[in-house]
Amino acid sequence: MLDTNPSSRFTVLLPNEQEEWHRTVRGLLEPQGIQTLSARSGREAIEMIESNAVHVAVLDVQMPQLGGMQVVKRVRELHASEPQRRLPPAILVANDLTSHLLREALMNHVFSVLSKPVDYSLLLDALARVVRRHYESRWPGFQ
């Protein structure tokens, strides 16, 4: 079950196939008290979501092995029999925001879709909106 205990730090899962991007985003988030985890592939992202208290997952549509959309679908399938389990909201990043991708994201309850290269202020805004909508306007881990 997703840990939403106020004593746990707000945790963001980030794709890590582009080390420089990951390092930059981690550098923006960690000084604000946000813990980051990294996944080099879609399969690793699923493992991280299953074994950690992930509050939001940022997933690249073109991650190796399984793309971000496939990760979202697979995690939902794995927990279809557990309606009480709170799955982390997903933010997808993609090179090409096609109408098909946006429609698929909407049908799969993806929180936000951002165009690559990702504007860091848009990513921070999307994370703030996740907090407002899913965590009662408080970063988990902060009183």
Locate each region found by the language model.
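Non-catalytic signal-transmission and effector/linker regions of two-component phosphorelay proteins
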Residues: 1-23, 83, 121-143
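Two-component/phosphorelay signaling modules centered on CheY-like receiver
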Residues: 19-37, 108
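Acidic catalytic/metal-coordinating carboxylates
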Residues: 41, 67-73
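Short alpha-helical segment
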Residues: 44-45
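His-Asp phosphorelay/catalytic-motif detector in bacterial-type signaling
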Residues: 53-55, 80-89
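Active-site beta3 strand of CheY-like receiver
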Residues: 53-58, 63
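The feature encodes the CheY-like receiver
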Residues: 64-67, 94, 98, 117
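Alpha4 helix (beta4-alpha4-beta5 surface) of REC/receiver domains from two-component response regulators
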Residues: 70, 86, 96-113
